[in-house]
Amino acid sequence: MQTCLPFFGVVRVSGDDRADFLHNQLSNDILNLPSGQACYATYNTAKGRVLANMVVLNRGDDLLLVMAQDLVEPILKKLRMYVLRAKVVFEPLADFAVAGELADDAKATTAVEPNLAFAAENQNNVWCINLPHTGRFKVGLSEQLPPYDAAAENAWNLHEICSGYAWISLATKETAVAQMLNQHIIGGVHFRKGCYPGQEIIARAQYRGQVKRGLAVLRGSSLEAAGIAVKVGEEEAGQIINTALTDDGSLNLAVIKFSAAEAALTDADGNALTVEQLFFTVEPKE
């Protein structure tokens, strides 16, 4: 199946200092990303909270950033604050779009080890990016991409949810550190590169085991929305990041407390949410 994915927007980054600048701002090794390859990356606050996660594509003469459409303007506004004398230009590409391509029999594919870069190829000016979960992004002019198909978009979202690939949007920015979103597993964080905003917090969380929340797939009886609270009784226990429809309700990718993994979960309205899958390990009770 193929469909345009209106969730995503595209930014072109050009100028002689583009790789150096992004290397110092993002969580992955952009400086050593080869032409014709792509990677996942996060842009974080100084406190390590994820402002946006993205795919970075090196086209040789420039870089493309694929992120949530509703984050494009706020992220560019923040990045431009730090350009100063660097030779780098950010340009949102309004005539570009992103499509998803997925085999009809594709199975959910969870990350086993970080994939810090993956192949991309130019096919008649449409860049095809082979994502680690077996789906493909197609990035190019809107008229060159497959049309929008709601059922196919939902199938794409289900595949990413069940594979553990979260996407931050305006409703969920600054709610989680990278590890809570599985970025250390899928390859969105390079732990041996230099400093970037939030690097100290993210590294400390990784090596001192300070992360107390992680991704989970939750089944609900109705359609949820990004940013909806997950609760245990009256207490906050997490937040829904992404959602997709099923025949009997929804599947939702949420960040939840480790301690809530075996509890009775609900959304903010009291609707039951059932844990289908955890992307973290719960220590057995003694």
How does the language model describe each region?
Residues 1-53:
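Acidic, proline/glycine-enriched N-terminal capping motif
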Residues 2-12, 55-163:
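Acidic, low-complexity central loop/insert segments
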Residues 15, 65, 198, 234:
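Residue-level signal for inorganic ion chemistry
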Residues 29-30, 80-88, 148-156, 232-237, ...:
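A common structural junction motif
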Residues 42-43, 103-121, 221-235:
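Short amphipathic alpha-helix segments
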Residues 137-217:
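Anionic-ligand-binding alpha/beta catalytic cores of soluble enzymes and soluble regulatory domains
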